[in-house]
């Protein structure tokens, strides 16, 4: 199918190299001469031309690389035994390294296993110790409750000993418990009289520490009476195995005294250092303090000391505890366990004899006393086994290396056999690539050289249009402009195709309003649609964000290609552009039956919309990748579905498979009738792919076509310039249209202006509301087709409105188009004195029409949508402007365009001259700077000018400015870039170079006004 691309870059891009795979013969316009050279003729020209210097250089590089490649293989073939020897050596080293690596992994695994077993034993030891601690604390509470809180006491030595023995199973880690009461010096005499014994010291007459917390049973006779002290802690209750410690003062021993003082001060259980028990095994004493009453957790130390009335101690046999634990955790691989008290610099062994060597793991033990530190050291009892896995793996690697060396030897002989054939094929390939590069550079150079003067031609034609011409001359100029734009469009298509094939086409990411882009596209094809009597409309879903981030130029190019094709191949009916999000389309597909639907914009049937969406899968090369359109995307991304529906001639079934093939036409008759190059749809498909989308279509001959594509864009976090105006807020409108799709389009444009809209299908319903007084709408928009269809009601409606003297009488609008204007229908508006709005509807055009009807005044005086000469003239009159461009034609065009608006223009043909003329102080109000110039480009010239201006501003701040700058606070000359290729990278470079904006070549009044108004409106000079 033939199509025409109306998007693409301008004519100022400097192309160095582009690659075009092929180009078919095409016709420009309706059948003039050849628009470009055919492929065969291009080949002839290329063969006749000498190879360019750059191509020759590349050919020499390619030839040199090939020669080096063949020489390298020849060297390998001649010295293959050295390579084989090196390979065997490398294989041996690799196998040895593998052995070391796997052996290290085995050791790491063994180390992790030891750590796991050691940590498990340490954890269980801590858990069992904590359980015993809890039971000791419960016993302390029992003593406090039944001994100190009862009068008389409910506990005596026999009761305590019996209870301790019967509950010993709850304290499997303790070998005995004892309770000592707190006695002051003043209470000692009475206490000893009540107990029947005197308080004794913990030390014997020999002043040596015993192996237990007091003398043994046979040492009672040698026990000494406790000398006077401030307070005492004599044992009054003890388990039978330790009842020999009854009457001994626990505060008389240094270790026990320190333990008791820390316990009653902290309110927690504390441990002693390891000591030998009566059974000659190491143990520790855990001490808890008994208080008169329950203390809060935040009690202070002195409060705890005052409330202390006794001390409960439990003796732990560490060796028995660890032995019991090891029996419970007997594993397949036994380990040696050693427990140490590491509180002091010299660790004290509490269990085990650390005589082993080798791998060791240390686990920290926490017995609840932060002042004591304990550790568990673990080692394997057996030596590690041989690392058979590492040995076999490394040996296997060595065998593989030897086999690979043998294969390498066979490969060398094989390569030597086919080397000559490969050399011949490489030479042929090199020649083909050289020819392809020459052809691509030729096409790119010729296209660029044609486009550059064409911009000058178009600019001069625009200037010629502003002179006094008669009707015939104006028609000639318009025809020349149309032909020039068609040629530029054709060149842009060729350059885009070359960019795509060379992989140099990139997308920009800038914020833009998609609704405004769609309106601009409708404005572009408005005249052609009206000439052919077609209904042209656009609808954008409310779920589409106001501002998106993407490449508006490429989206405009895709939609323009599709709409342009629809205009070209449609003779009656409509062309309908819609934009939705993917979720909306998917929900519609679930309920759509797929039957051909006549509920359309114009009433003509259209191709199956469902097949248009599903055909995206058909034209995807990989079937499984068709799910990518439905795959989840990032939260800031949005996937859009854009469709162009027409009621044209459709695409023959036999031609549908090659629609997206470059340079392919549906048939030879299409090229003769409609022209075109046949690459617009191919370019569109590539652009859609760059946007992470897909494109497909549904077409039925003599019914129409529906092209659908998806695009993934980003949501903009900034708010867009909503077109809604405060002047339309609170206004209600009624749309009368018997076609629901068309009514929805009208409602969409009204809602963009902030107008609340209601729909009705018949004029009778509107008349009924008018008669009943229930009509709240201030605006009534009636489609002309509905008006003519129900013409029997129109006289009654007009008379009703004329006789209505109310000030809030609704304004009546007729929505007309060439498609709804049969013979005689064009006089309808004049006959009934109605306001007419011509379709296709655009928000800006609708806004102006409604404002005029409501008695408003246009804010900007325009003619045919273009800023008038008077508006620009008021801004540029007598302004001193310098234009910098190395192209004389571009200088003339730019100077002529600015002089037309009253500016006084000075021209400079290089960046160096511009720097000289713009050295401050000077009299210029603004500068238009070309970006690409020889010697010094526009970016560098602008940077140097800004440096000179900053130097002057610093002098002004210091008060050293020249006299002509005495009244100036800050000097800055507006510099606008002149370019025809304003992509994102170019725009960013303009900002980096401190330019103030850009205008396209040739100048367009509307863009020129929007740029210069920022500097010249409301003041005479910007500095």
From Swiss-Prot:
The chain crosses the membrane at residues 81-101, 388-408. It is an enzyme of class 2 (transferase). GO terms for cellular component: nucleus; plasma membrane. It is found in: Cell membrane. Residues 445-715 form the Histidine kinase domain. Activation probably requires a transfer of a phosphate group between a His in the transmitter domain and an Asp of the receiver domain. Residues 151-352 form the CHASE domain. It is a multi-pass membrane protein. Histidine-containing phosphotransfer domain (HPt) contains an active histidine that mediates the phosphotransfer. This is Probable histidine kinase 3. It comes from Oryza sativa subsp. indica (Rice). The lineage of its organism: Eukaryota, Viridiplantae, Streptophyta, Embryophyta, Tracheophyta. The gene is HK3.
